[in-house]
Amino acid sequence: MAENHAQNKAKLISETRRRFEAEYVTDKSDKYDARDVERLQQDDNWVESYLSWRHNIVDETLKMLDESFQWRKEISVNDLNESSIPRWLLEIGVIYLHGYDKEGNKLFWIRVKYHVKDQKTILDKKKLIAFWLERYAKRENGKPVTVMFDLSETGINSIDMDFVRFIINCFKVYYPKYLSKIVIFDMPWLMNAAFKIVKTWLGPEAVSLLKFTSKNEVQDYVSVEYLPPHMGGTDPFKYSYPPLVDDDFQTPLCENGPITSEDETSSKEDIESDGKETLETISNEEQTPLLKKINPTESTSKAEENEKVDSKVKAFKKPLSVFKGPLLHISPAEELYFGSTESGEKKTLIVLTNVTKNIVAFKVRTTAPEKYRVKPSNSSCDPGASVDIVVSPHGGLTVSAQDRFLIMAAEMEQSSGTGPAELTQFWKEVPRNKVMEHRLRCHTVESSKPNTLTLKDNAFNMSDKTSEDICLQLSRLLESNRKLEDQVQRCIWFQQLLLSLTMLLLAFVTSFFYLLYS
């Protein structure tokens, strides 16, 4: 059954390519970008995305390809970069990628209150949409996005139906299969009629993708960790440019250069005390070096060796939460906790445990590769074994809450080698749907003193929960305060209006009696 399906799909892809070349490219070669035509002949997934969106009807798919390719050349999609977009548009933060919904789809934010309808800038705004979508499509081929229409504090000047229609067309024609859903937050009543029109543009099948939400419902689709405070979330993210804010996971620093002696002295507590609930500093003689790099051609001077022995290394704080994935258990589950510069405990630990019967290859990527050293960042883990990964900020660079880490893992065949060359080849060939991914956020603990603090699981979780609750309550309090201020302003306005009407009425009555008795 699956084999027949694959054969039918291959036939449809082949027919689509052949007919598009014969019926469209010959007559309209100057209307298309040659790079798009070439990609159509090579990228099966791209062709399949158009076919799937048109229910495998080749005639409809060809029309869609024609419209899409003409638009791509008209707006120069393949050549779009940051310099193609006016800097003020990138700085204002009306459109950007940040965070994930509960299904793991990237969030495509559209902050409508920052948009002003203006025909002079509409082309630049369309290019901005295309820039972000093309940038995402090249990195995450086939992964859908969730569009977040944030309509809070939106005025009449921000309503631009042509711009909304363009966004809808992007997902209907230009980037098929990339739309997971459209979450519309805090829609003003005056836009009800407008979004009835939007439903007709989407078509009957895509209407179900529209999700109208308020502060209570939006958390059904996006966790509070990726929602801003005005949506009832706890995400501290503040948009700024430069740089671009999307999660661009890259190779960390340690794979691009030599590992210094400072990193080689990294060590961890080797024996867990039974019955003890405190983390203590232990001497270097009781610790074993972690992930020491072995190079027979590289000699270490006696002075450097003495420095290693004399240096005092603090014990790592043991991660207390675990993400249980199908290939690896990853600890911590969600956040990497770094100590402050003052505390001197800037390093943190990621523990990977292989829960399969085969070797699992893993890679670690980060959105800030120039800031972190990761050891090891590309290796493998034997069945049932655990690997400790040391993450440390490079030099004096500070940890940011916007930084992210991505753990990628895939199961290897038993006959596969685990050397650097074999791992490189393995990652080139492994299908994307076989790769497990897990993301970790960064958090700085300003006054962390794990040598003297008692770290009980329950107390630790309680403090995390309490902190999150306080942050959530504070954001709700600020939102209530803002609404109260708005109500006070409206009351003052009505009071002034009433006073003016009273004065006007008094003047009218006075004039009436004056004329009556004079």
From Swiss-Prot:
Residues 1-496 are cytoplasmic. Residues 327-445 form the MSP domain. SMART domains: SEC14 (SM00516). One of its GO terms (molecular function) is FFAT motif binding. The chain crosses the membrane at residues 497-518. CDD domains: SEC14. This is Motile sperm domain-containing protein 2. It comes from Homo sapiens.
